[in-house]
């Protein structure tokens, strides 16, 4: 009764007999273990998964069934007492589960699916290759074609409802079996070494397209199914034709099969993550989708992206859900992790072939043969002698080259095959500095002779180790990679993001609001604003910006209000070049918008053409208190804050990472529910806190920084890496400036912003503070405005009247 759930036959015994579907494949002999590391008929794998399952007892079977879900807990005792050997799983069916006492239909269905998948890995998985899978899909297409044709004939004669139901069930069973075989076939094409070959990529796309169209025509009402019967037959023929291309392909890659291998991961401490990403391709099959570089998983050379996990520390995880597998890996406080994986197909190890034997020697060589079958011409022009190095000199060169190779460092990951091809090496930096006369790392064999085209063809193709799969999943993925950011950015990337390097487009898109009457004509509902981020009043104002003459491309500073951005900076989403700015909203818009509950004031222009500054009294209002009333906002934007333990205990069903509006005002960090709130829900004094960009928090969030204000720790997550860098940089700078100021007034943010034009001059600026005090001191006038005096910073400073 479960033949239509996963594409397997009704019983596991019929599953073994179903292998006769692809008995027409005669190109691969039973003794040729193509997926093994050696092409030998006498090769025996080191680990047999089928033998391991056959030796199971009742306790091992109950432990495996326990991982299928919590709904299996009431039946564990029944399974342990009645199924006492792993061999009994091959004869397990729905009736035997009923006799045991498992009355729930859902529990029997889950157990039967897991057992069928387990037997598949025990028997069929070791013999699979791409040609065999393509033949199975082709055979299933012919079966669908024959079943649909007979169903269309029987529909004309069927009178009773039960007869029509039997016809529909036969068609559904045939299509579902085809879908299951196609799923495995596409899963193979998504992994190396097939994901980089254009021929296999084209076949993969065509097969997926045909299968999706076929399923759309089948998943219809019963009356419409027979109307589209001719289309189903046509698409089945096209799908079979695409699979025939793989069967007739002369590439030896289609004969390579997977094999089972054990891997052991080690780490120095519990704080180090394993560096694995695990995804479920379909229920019960767990695949390593990504391996982080430098992690314990990367150090182990026996696992790659695309390998399927069968056992974790002696426990079989085939058929489990992804959550149980994640708990099995993440909850282990051990320094070693043992995995049994089904490796992806790889290149076999071929015997080394001597290239010197196939190369002809020069006639004048001393090692050449002393006789010749050609006619001797005493007056012919003889070939000049070639001077060779002595054996002593060659041996010295070989020893020197081997010494350099031993001290050199490996450039790429080791290849997945054990072939005769050498891996790339690079010289040590220190050794290169010492040996100035020899800059290239060359091989003595390549110096003596060159490799021709025929010898190039003898070199086997290498399938390099991969850390990521070609098709990343769109759904549920559990990550074991730690949240550490990469701060190294190339100079070219930074220069491309600067506002004055962006070319203005010639054509612009024009956006107009549609009238209500036109919406009625188009029969469209009136739009409603449901996003809380855009309910605040929206107003945009551009102020002129100033950049000192002679500064570099990175040293431009802006005298605009912290809530306002220059026109050029709003053309991109980057605020790196601006000393202070507003982070863009996390919505889909890429414009740097400004939303404030208060209207914008007017700017006052000084008498000098190079001096522009906003009036602090006319700046947009914001919730303030007595402690930071005179401080100007330095930075603000949307972030996510992780709730504290007390907040999570108060309400269990809550969002752990709510989105908040955060504002940096002086050395105070103000947290609001949104930008329209008048009072902050939390205020953090950065002088008494510790700002850290490294955290041991286990979460899938990225771009995390931590603020420790005893006795609490606050974790924040930014939406982009650029926001993370801006927040951490400006908070640390504000903390350093106000901490060194000591007894100076707190209203010095206006003068601080003037010296933030160049981030490279921060060390110089902070050094002047400790030596002779601040170079610029604020002065408060009677009208409340803040002015500053130039302290001799050259072109980087400015005067304000």
From Swiss-Prot:
Compositionally skewed regions (Polar residues) per UniProt: 363-373, 776-790
Domain of life: Eukaryota
PH domain mapped to chain residues: 632-736
Compositional bias of kind Gly residues: 791-801
This protein's GO CC annotations: cytoplasm; membrane
Membrane topology qualifier: Peripheral membrane protein
Family of the protein in this entry: Belongs to the CNKSR family.
The protein, known as: Connector enhancer of kinase suppressor of ras
Organism: Caenorhabditis elegans
């Amino acid at each position: 009764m479960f033949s239509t759930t996963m594409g397997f036959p009704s019983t596991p015994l019929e599953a073994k007999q179903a292998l006769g579907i692809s008995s027409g494949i005669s190109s691969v002999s039973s003794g040729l273990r193509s997926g093994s590391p050696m092409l030998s008929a006498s090769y025996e794998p080191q680990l047999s998964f089928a033998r391991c399952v056959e030796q199971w007892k009742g306790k091992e079977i109950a432990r495996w069934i326990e991982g299928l879900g919590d709904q299996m807990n009431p039946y564990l005792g029944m399974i342990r007492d009645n199924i006492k050997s792993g061999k009994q799983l091959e004869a397990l069916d729905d009736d035997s589960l009923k006799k045991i006492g498992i009355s729930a239909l859902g529990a029997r269905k889950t157990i039967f699916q897991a057992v069928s998948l387990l037997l598949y890995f025990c028997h069929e998985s070791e013999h699979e290759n791409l040609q065999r899978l393509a033949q199975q899909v082709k055979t299933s297409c012919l079966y669908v074609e024959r079943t649909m044709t007979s169903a269309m004939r029987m529909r004309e004669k069927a009178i009773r409802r039960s007869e029509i139901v039997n016809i529909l069930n036969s068609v559904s069973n045939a299509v579902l079996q085809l879908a299951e075989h196609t799923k495995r076939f596409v899963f193979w094409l998504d992994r190396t070494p097939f994901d980089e070959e254009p021929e296999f990529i084209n076949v993969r796309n065509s097969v997926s397209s045909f299968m999706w169209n076929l399923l759309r025509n089948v998943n219809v009402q019963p009356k419409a199914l027979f109307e589209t019967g001719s289309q189903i037959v046509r698409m089945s023929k096209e799908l079979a034709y695409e699979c025939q291309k793989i069967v007739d392909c002369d590439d030896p890659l289609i004969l390579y099969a997977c094999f089972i291998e054990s891997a052991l991961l080690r780490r120095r401490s519990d704080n180090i993550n394993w560096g694995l990403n695990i995804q479920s391709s379909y229920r019960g099959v767990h695949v390593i989708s990504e391996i982080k570089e430098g992690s314990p998983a990367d150090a182990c050379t026996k696992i790659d992206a695309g390998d399927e996990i069968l056992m974790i520390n002696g426990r079989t995880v085939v058929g489990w859900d992804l959550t149980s597998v994640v708990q099995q890996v993440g909850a282990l406080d051990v320094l070693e992790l043992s995995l049994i994986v089904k490796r992806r197909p790889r290149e076999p190890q071929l015997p080394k072939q001597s290239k010197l034997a196939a190369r002809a020697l020069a006639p004048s060589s001393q090692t050449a043969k002393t006789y010749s079958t050609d006619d001797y011409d005493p007056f012919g022009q003889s070939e000049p002698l070639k001077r060779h190095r002595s054996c002593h000199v060659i041996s010295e060169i070989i020893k020197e080259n081997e010494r350099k190779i031993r001290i050199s460092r490996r450039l790429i990951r080791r290849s997945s095959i054990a072939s005769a091809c050498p891996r790339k090496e690079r010289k040590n930096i220190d050794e290169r500095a010492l040996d100035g006369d020899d800059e290239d790392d060359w091989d003595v064999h390549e110096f003596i002779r060159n490799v021709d085209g025929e010898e190039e063809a003898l070199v086997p193709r290498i399938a390099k180790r991969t850390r990521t799969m070609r098709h990343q999943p769109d759904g549920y993925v559990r990550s074991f990679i730690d949240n550490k950011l990469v701060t190294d950015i190339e100079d070219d990337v930074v220069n491309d993001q600067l506002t004055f390097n962006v070319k203005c487009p010639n054509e612009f898109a024009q956006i107009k609001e549609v009238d209500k009457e036109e919406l009625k004509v188009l029969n469209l509902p009136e739009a409603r604003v449901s996003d809380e981020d855009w309910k605040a009043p929206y107003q945009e104002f551009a102020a002129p910006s100033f950049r000192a003459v002679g500064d570099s491309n990175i040293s431009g500073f802006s005298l605009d209000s912290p809530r306002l951005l220059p026109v050029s900076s709003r053309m991109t989403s980057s605020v790196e070049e601006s000393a202070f700015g507003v982070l863009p909203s996390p919505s889909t818009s890429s414009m740097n918008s400004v939303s404030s509950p208060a209207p914008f004031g007017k700017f006052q222009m000084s008498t000098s053409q190079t001096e522009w500054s906003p009036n602090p009294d006319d700046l947009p209002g914001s919730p303030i208190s007595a402690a930071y009333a005179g401080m100007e906002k330095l930075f603000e934007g949307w972030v996510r804050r992780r709730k504290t333990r007390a907040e999570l205990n108060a309400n269990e069903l809550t969002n752990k990472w709510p989105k908040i509006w955060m504002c940096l005002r002086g050395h105070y960090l103000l947290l609001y529910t949104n930008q329209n709130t008048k009072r902050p829900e939390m205020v953090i004094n950065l002088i008494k806190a510790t700002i850290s960009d490294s955290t041991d928090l286990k979460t899938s969030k990225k771009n995390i920084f931590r603020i420790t204000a005893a006795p609490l720790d606050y974790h924040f997550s930014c939406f982009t890496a650029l926001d993370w860098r801006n927040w951490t940089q400006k908070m640390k700078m504000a903390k350093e400036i106000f901490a060194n100021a000591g007894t100076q007034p707190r209203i010095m943010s206006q003068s601080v912003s003037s010296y933030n034009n160049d981030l490279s001059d921060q060390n110089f600026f902070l050094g002047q503070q400790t030596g002779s005090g601040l170079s610029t001191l604020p002065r408060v006038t009677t009208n409340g405005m803040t002015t500053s005096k130039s302290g001799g910073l050259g072109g980087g400073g400015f005067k304000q009247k």
